[in-house]
Amino acid sequence: MKFTIAFAGLLGVFLTPALADYSISVNDDGNSGGSGQQSVSVNNEHNVANVDNNNGWNSWNALWDYRTGFAVTRLFEKKSCIVHKMKKEAMPSLQALDALVKEKKLQGKGPGGPPPKSLRYSVNPNRVDNLDKFGKSIVAMCKGIPTYMAEEIQGANLISYSEKCISANILWILNISFCGGIAEN
């Protein structure tokens, strides 16, 4: 009996950090044209990362659901959500993001590594009828909010694309632009 209690205690000590949520906050005042604050939370248990950008009316939240392969950005100014498929080649893995958070490499002036990757999406003007196909986390974030699907714009289409875009620059990792659709309003 004593062995079982000791084993359970040790298991809890070692397992808790592996399943814990980690958060950091980053002040964005030093960037050109940027202000406000971003924070990132990693939830290993649910395979989800959440980025909050607090900048007054231009605030937004991004949620990356690694289990379903979808991401969503909730734009407070537009009172809407934009869902898109995660591009695994451009977005850091949950483990890599978790490591950056734990090591606090995202604080200060950035990790000092390569420039952030950029993704550009075209927003479909038609609302998404059923959020369930995107997973519980996205449903919880966007239920009751107009939600739109976005498709990545690739290659030569990027050069000739002239529609208005909304940017969501995520720390010093990824620059995402949502173009057309609700960005035009």
From Swiss-Prot:
The gene is GKN1. Disulfide bonds join 81-142. Coiled coil: none annotated. PROSITE patterns: BRICHOS. It comes from the Eukaryota. The keyword Transferase does not apply. Gene3D superfamilies: 3.30.390.150. Residues 1-20 form the signal peptide. InterPro entries: BRICHOS_dom, Gastrokine. One of its GO terms (cellular component) is extracellular region. Highly expressed specifically in surface cells of the antrum mucosa from where it is secreted. It comes from Sus scrofa (Pig). Has mitogenic activity and may be involved in maintaining the integrity of the gastric mucosal epithelium. Keywords: Disulfide bond, Golgi apparatus, Mitogen, Secreted, Signal. Belongs to the gastrokine family. Residues 54-150 form the BRICHOS domain. This is Gastrokine-1. Pfam families: BRICHOS. Its main location: secreted. One of its GO terms (biological process) is regulation of cell population proliferation. It is found in: Secreted; Cytoplasmic granule; Golgi apparatus. The keyword Glycosyltransferase does not apply.
